[in-house]
Design a protein with these regions (language model features):
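Individual transmembrane alpha-helix segments
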Residues: 2-34, 169
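Juxtamembrane interface elements at the cytosolic ends of transmembrane helices
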Residues: 7, 20, 30-58, 190-199
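Hydrophobic cores of alpha-helical transmembrane segments in multi-pass inner/ER membrane proteins
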Residues: 26-34, 105-111, 175-189
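Membrane-water interface at loop-to-transmembrane-helix junctions
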Residues: 53-74
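Structural signature of hydrophobic alpha-helical transmembrane segments
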Residues: 70, 94-105, 176
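Membrane-interface helix caps and helix-loop-helix hairpins in membrane proteins
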Residues: 86-95
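Alpha-helical transmembrane segments
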Residues: 112-127
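Hydrophobic alpha-helical membrane-insertion segments
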Residues: 128-145
Length: 199
């Protein structure tokens, strides 16, 4: 496989379609939860409207000053560490699932500290669905080449690069990135839907 991390080679090369299926399950789960829990903005009663306004006022107040200061320092570090874990998944322990979980936790931390409205300025339902769908299509395209080469990888081999380099191990790095983004979007999507009823 060209990957120094044997587990990444196993999961994203030999068992790539199994991992693709797991990523699709995550996507379908977040879409199902979205359909079931998304708040209907046209059909809100007075009590629910008042509750939403109170939540917005609490988010706007400086009652979470310590949390905001801590998250302002910590959230970028957490997200950056998650990106590092995703990008080095073929070289060391980690990869798309663990790095995506770390990135998702960073997004949740930011949302808890600064409020759902501020998070919606750059992460909306459109962002969630487009990112997840694009990652799944990219994953499918990267691994479908074997079907076009006789389903045995004999006709055309993906260049593996130099073992130990960041751009090595063929398609394992892009697949790790795709899986990481799907997991991060799913984690944040579940959090937002269960707490606010919208992404």
């Amino acid at each position: 496989t060209g990957a120094i991390n044997f587990v990444a080679g196993m999961i994203l090369d030999y068992r790539a379609f199994d991992t693709f299926g797991e990523s699709n399950v995550l996507f379908m789960a977040v879409i199902a939860v979205l359909m079931l829990l998304q708040r209907d903005k046209k059909n809100i009663d007075a009590a629910e409207d008042q509750e939403m306004q109170e939540d917005e006022m609490l988010d706007a107040e400086d009652s979470k000053l310590i949390l905001k200061k801590g998250a302002k320092c910590l959230a970028p570090v957490v997200i950056l560490y998650g990106i590092y874990v995703v990008l080095n998944g073929h070289l060391s322990p980690g990869g798309g699932f663990s790095g995506g979980s770390i990135i998702g936790a960073g997004l949740i931390l930011y949302s808890v500290a600064f409020g759902h409205k501020k998070m919606q300025t750059f992460f909306t339902i459109k962002t969630l669905t487009l990112t997840t769908a694009a990652c799944l299509l990219t994953y499918c395209g990267c691994k479908s080449y074997s079907f076009f080469t006789g389903a045995n990888h004999v006709g055309w081999e993906v260049p593996k690069g130099t073992p130990g380099a960041i751009l090595s191990s063929g398609f394992i790095l892009p697949l790790n990135i795709c899986v990481g983004l799907v997991v991060a979007c799913t984690m944040y999507g579940f959090y937002a839907l269960f707490t606010k009823g919208e992404v």
